[in-house]
């Protein structure tokens, strides 16, 4: 399986080893005009852990408090997929991490999100689905997203092509934290790292933390997104052997739950 979809998925209960990094190009909700106000990246590990961070490029008004359209993440157990044909796939998500749910935001979909994917001739990938923000028995809201698969082994946005490095050989490391007060997930694919950290008892913007970083050709790590009052609880290094523990601030220990190093 090549990197054609924004998330590594479980095909008929079998995990297909791959990493993926994808940049969203377009977003449309209902009958509203298509637009893109964020720099959204979705990444997934060989084993199917996934994360999507969606920061606004130019936050407006109250968006400045939490300048993200949305963010979510999950383990392989939180998604299921079925291959329809060579170009189309169905993926059902039940996120482990969802900023809207954590914030107890009004008009928030809860539970499984059913999505439908189709690869275009250009290599872009279409995603369509429906959510039920007003309740499962209320009016559905349709959405459309368009994704560009990115070469995770490069430190810049280079789209996947026949000349790209085999993405299944790219670095794939996942860190997880779950203690009395916090839970989080950090996923590194190739040169790109994204992380999410929730404070369990804090259901405001103060309980949410995000990380995005990229490693350059000389090995230097550049932090691209840094958000949250507990950001320093993220580890200072993002890679390690399976079952190793990496430390953040204030005694936060992150366990390596997946690694191909």
Swiss-Prot record:
<keyword id="KW-0539">Nucleus</keyword>
<dbReference type="GO" id="GO:0005737">
    <property type="term" value="C:cytoplasm"/>
</dbReference>
<protein>
    <recommendedName>
        <fullName>Protein HRI1</fullName>
    </recommendedName>
</protein>
<dbReference type="InterPro" id="IPR038744">
    <property type="entry name" value="Hri1_N"/>
</dbReference>
<comment type="similarity">
    <text>Belongs to the HRI1 family.</text>
</comment>
<dbReference type="Pfam" id="PF16815">
    <property type="entry name" value="HRI1"/>
</dbReference>
<dbReference type="GO" id="GO:0005634">
    <property type="term" value="C:nucleus"/>
</dbReference>
<dbReference type="InterPro" id="IPR031818">
    <property type="entry name" value="Hri1"/>
</dbReference>
<dbReference type="InterPro" id="IPR043047">
    <property type="entry name" value="Hri1_N_sf"/>
</dbReference>
<keyword id="KW-0963">Cytoplasm</keyword>
């Amino acid at each position: 399986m090549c990197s054609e979809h924004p998330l590594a998925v479980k095909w008929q209960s079998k995990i297909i080893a791959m990493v993926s990094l994808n940049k969203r190009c377009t977003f449309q909700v209902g009958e509203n005009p298509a637009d893109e106000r964020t720099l959204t990246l979705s990444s997934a590990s060989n084993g199917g852990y996934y994360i999507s961070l969606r920061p606004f490029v130019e936050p407006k008004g109250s968006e400045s408090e939490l300048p993200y359209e949305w963010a979510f993440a999950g383990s392989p157990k939180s998604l299921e997929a079925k291959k329809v044909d060579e170009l189309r796939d169905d993926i059902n998500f039940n996120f482990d991490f969802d900023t809207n749910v954590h914030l107890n935001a009004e008009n928030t979909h809860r539970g499984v999100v059913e999505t439908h994917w189709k690869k275009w001739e250009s290599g872009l990938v279409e995603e369509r689905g429906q959510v039920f923000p007003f309740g499962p028995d209320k009016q559905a809201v349709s959405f459309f997203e368009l994704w560009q698969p990115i070469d995770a082994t490069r430190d810049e946005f280079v789209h996947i092509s026949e000349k790209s490095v085999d993405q299944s050989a790219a670095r794939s490391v996942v860190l997880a934290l779950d203690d009395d007060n916090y839970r989080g997930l950090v996923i590194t694919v190739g040169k790109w790292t994204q992380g999410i950290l929730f404070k369990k008892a804090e259901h405001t913007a103060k309980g949410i933390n995000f990380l995005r970083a990229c490693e350059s050709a000389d090995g230097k790590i550049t932090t691209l997104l840094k958000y949250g009052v507990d950001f320093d609880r993220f580890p200072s290094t993002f890679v390690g052997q399976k079952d190793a523990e990496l430390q953040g601030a204030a005694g936060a220990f992150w366990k390596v739950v997946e690694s191909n190093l």
